[in-house]
């Protein structure tokens, strides 16, 4: 099924307007800055988060100039965070292409990330909405908090779902959460509608991250990324956390602690992956996605009246679960 076409259908023109405004925001006359920004623009992406903002605005009213400036601000903040993340993670790839730090260097990456972040703040200032500016500021702080929390979690001997959810809510889900609620705010939604949109976004973001985490337990040829990559980076995700907690296997718990200290080898990771699959870790993670899928569908059933928007948001939700990368 062509989920993306269904998602874009009711916001096709608005999405084109967004892309134009976003690209204009990432233009500059300075030679070096211009080259870096052009590299970032060329990476493109599916625009999943801006589409969520536009759909929410259209659901509760119209996509206005306020919506567009807010959506651009959100995407710019997200882009800046990715540029900085690649420096922190020492990553040389982003969406299959060379990262900014790989193509240029860390100094350029940090400075360009700062420039994009400042541009995000400028964009949302054009909304003249104190609430939208506040939400975007809250988002930036929460994303940073999530990154620091994940770093500090390496030294935390506790392995728990609670710690896992705290990190993914701050690192991933909050972005979907704010895209949804800011879209609603831009359309003049009521407090009750904004709260519902925010919860929908958080549930959607959690589903997105759990699906991403499940990819790590399959071969690269199946999902497009190497098996056990998260564990190589010291991350324990929901499937293995469940398998460890449900069995209490001491040998595997010892391996899990080695993962957190990044002292594990590929053979040990393969053992943990096999252990997770054998003890229902994948199935449990899928059950958790299903629970949040049901909550998202309740929002769509109760809060979305327009058939085209209902179809688009349902396709969005289905795409997040069905995607292979």
PLM region spans:
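All-alpha prenyltransferase/terpene-synthase fold signal
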Residues: 1-325
């Amino acid at each position: 099924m062509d989920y993306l076409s269904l998602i874009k259908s009711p916001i096709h023109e608005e999405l084109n307007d967004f892309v134009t405004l976003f690209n204009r925001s990432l233009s500059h006359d300075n030679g070096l800055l211009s080259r870096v920004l052009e590299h970032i623009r060329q990476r493109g992406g599916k625009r999943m988060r801006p589409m969520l903002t536009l759909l929410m605005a259209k659901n509760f009213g119209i996509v206005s100039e306020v919506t567009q400036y807010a959506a651009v601000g959100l995407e710019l903040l997200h882009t800046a965070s990715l540029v900085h993340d690649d420096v922190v993670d020492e990553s040389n790839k982003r969406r299959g292409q060379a990262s900014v730090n790989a193509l240029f260097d860390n100094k350029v990456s940090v400075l360009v990330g700062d420039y994009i972040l400042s541009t995000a703040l400028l964009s949302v200032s054009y909304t003249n909405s104190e609430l939208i500016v506040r939400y975007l500021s809250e988002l930036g702080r929460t994303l940073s908090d999530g990154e620091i929390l994940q770093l500090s979690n390496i030294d935390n001997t506790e392995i728990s779902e609670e710690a896992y959810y705290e990190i993914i809510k701050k690192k991933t889900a909050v972005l979907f959460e704010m895209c949804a609620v800011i879209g609603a705010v831009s359309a003049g939604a009521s407090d009750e509608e904004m709260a519902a949109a925010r919860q929908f976004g958080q549930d959607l973001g959690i589903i997105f991250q759990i699906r991403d985490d499940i990819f790590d337990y399959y071969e690269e040829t199946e999902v497009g990324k190497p098996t056990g990559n998260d564990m190589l980076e010291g991350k324990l995700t929901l499937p293995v956390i469940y398998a460890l907690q449900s069995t209490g296997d001491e040998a595997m718990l010892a391996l899990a602690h080695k993962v957190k200290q990044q002292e594990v080898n590929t053979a040990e990771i393969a053992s943990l992956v096999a252990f997770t699959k054998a003890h229902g870790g994948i199935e449990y993670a899928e059950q958790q996605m299903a629970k949040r899928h049901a909550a998202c569908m309740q929002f769509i059933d109760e809060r979305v009246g327009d058939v085209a928007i209902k179809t688009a948001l349902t396709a969005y939700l289905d795409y997040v679960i069905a995607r292979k990368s």
